[in-house]
Amino acid sequence: YFGFNGKTSFSLNRVRDVLTAAPRAKKSLGQHFLKDAKTSARIVDLLRIGPEDRVLEIGPGPGAITGIIHERGPAEFRLIEKDSYWAAHHAELERPAPAVQVLNADALAFPWESLEGPWKIISNLPYNVGSPLMWDIVSRTPDLTRAVFMVQKEVAERLYAKPGTKDYGALSVWIQSYV
């Protein structure tokens, strides 16, 4: 597990150990695992987690982002993981408070409307579902206070495309209206 070394401090060596023993990333699920501690920390920093926050992470995999979020101590922390291997991995871990609720589910089928109260959502989005998942989350989560998504370069180019360019489209207009 990526995140704790007994003092609940971030450990990149631990994620490398977990990945060495784990099955390879599944291309069919669009998996790509973060291995860089600085990148993981920067992504979590953008979420601006406070002790009163509720945080939901999509696709934690080995836990590069998960460990850092847990260290920040949100009031509530949930994981949605489609891959049963990684869902079981997180469910079996003993962690200090706050408790982490692990849902072995497909985020594309998740009832975003069911999230009560304010939520912050974060993900190193699976490549094959990044765009539709962003649409679902932003349009269906009733009280989304902040969302941070790491996406592949091509998706990022579409998100921030300028009018008249080949990448400009409905996703560009829609997302840019929120930022």
Predicted segments, located by residue:
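Catalytic cores of RNA-modifying enzymes
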Residues: 1-179
